[in-house]
Amino acid sequence: MTISVFDTFFEKFIKTTRGSDLEPFQDELAASLESHFFSKRHGRKTEWDDALATLPKLEPKHFDLGQDLIQIGENSDLTISTEDFKAKLKGFMPWRKGPYELFGTNINTEWRSDWKWQRIVPHISSLQDKQVLDIGCGNGYHLFRMLASGAKLALGI
């Protein structure tokens, strides 16, 4: 993860949690995140950082987090060709959990996180205006679904 991505994420986190019960933990969390993201604990971290660096900065005009297929952006938002975008996404394979559609490109995943969501959602209380901590969040699929269900904050570690 590049420092600019980390800084952008953390600036948004600081702003979102200001005045909340999480505010006292901001400094400790920042130090932990920095230590985690800049360590080389995962064998493919360097490879994935390099793949991330090849992607253009994209700003989705549309996203839908409330459906089984999480959609982020549309093909018309791409600043490179669809073929180039698909080739760059292959740098992150294998895609373990989904389903996702990124800027018009369907990501074929090994596991269906939507099936798990469909099983658990009838058994959880309303997430409206809640702050949710998802321990072991993996790729964030369920965080997106929690936000779409009205969570004020969904934080995955």
Stretches found by the model and what they are:
Residues K130, S149-K152:
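Structured loop/turn residues at beta-strand edges in well-structured enzyme cores
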Residues K130-G138:
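Conserved class I S-adenosyl-L-methionine
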